[in-house]
From Swiss-Prot:
Name assigned to this protein: Pantothenate synthetase
Single GO cellular component term: cytosol
Organism: Shewanella baltica (strain OS195)
SUPFAM superfamilies linked: Nucleotidylyl transferase
Binding site for ATP: 30-37, 149-152, 178, 186-189
Claim: Nucleotide-binding is one of the keywords in the record: yes
General function of this protein: Catalyzes the condensation of pantoate with beta-alanine in an ATP-dependent reaction via a pantoyl-adenylate intermediate.
Pathway in which this enzyme or protein is active: Cofactor biosynthesis; (R)-pantothenate biosynthesis; (R)-pantothenate from (R)-pantoate and beta-alanine: step 1/1
Active-site residue numbers: H37 (proton donor)
Amino acid sequence: MITSAHIDDIRTQVRAWRAKGETVAFVPTMGNLHQGHITLVKEAASKCDHVVASIFVNPMQFGQNEDLDAYPRTLAADSEALTAAGAELLFTPTPAVMYPKGLEQQTYVEVPGISNVLCGASRPGHFRGVATIVCKLFNIVQPDVALFGNKDYQQLLVIKTMVEDLSLPIEIIGVDTIREDSGLAMSSRNGYLTAAEKAAAPALKQAIDAMAAGIKQGESFEQMTEQAKACLVAAGFTPDYLEIRHAHTLEQAQNQDHALVILAAAYIGKARLIDNLRFDR
């Protein structure tokens, strides 16, 4: 696998593949990779002739009191895992490469509406940071296909909306959430959990599953939401949000809606965990 922190190197290699009529898939990450990321890379390899990955801990998407400095950097292990999964080109830029004028003087990409609810309400500016860095990476790599995990459901919809609104010729593919045996969604932030917290953490998925089951049986949104929140609190979580939304727009779900998604974020110990369930009724 070729690794470079320089934009020109990435563009040169991709152009060489393009000159031979070959296709390119892209998997952007922040590193500290787990099996969910590896699944994205393997899926990417099945879609295109070549796979490009990136590792960049993006300061623009972290808030003032968030874990930017504490976010684990594990480049050597990540590189080995990416190579084994089928990535051929790895882009590892520094903040100076991506934001040479600094964050305050950087042009931003902002997706209105969908960026301002749920995680966007809890983390103001987060999705502006996500949309900006992903747009920049798309312009550098210019892939045919880009893959993202369904665990970050709101992020996936933000990126799909950005690609559609800006007429970017890229297919965005969401890949099913990879879970531990307990049902806990794999996340780089699971490393913050103590043994006791990790044992309690599967309650997040269990609460979401119970909500969906009740809604399918005709129970009210409000009743199932309150029951699920109570279960989370009993398990040691502090809920940030737990909501039922329209699956395509993330607008508040209405009783007549069929395409639904339950989205949750909750704190346990030092970790803020997110999960979701997309379903029809």
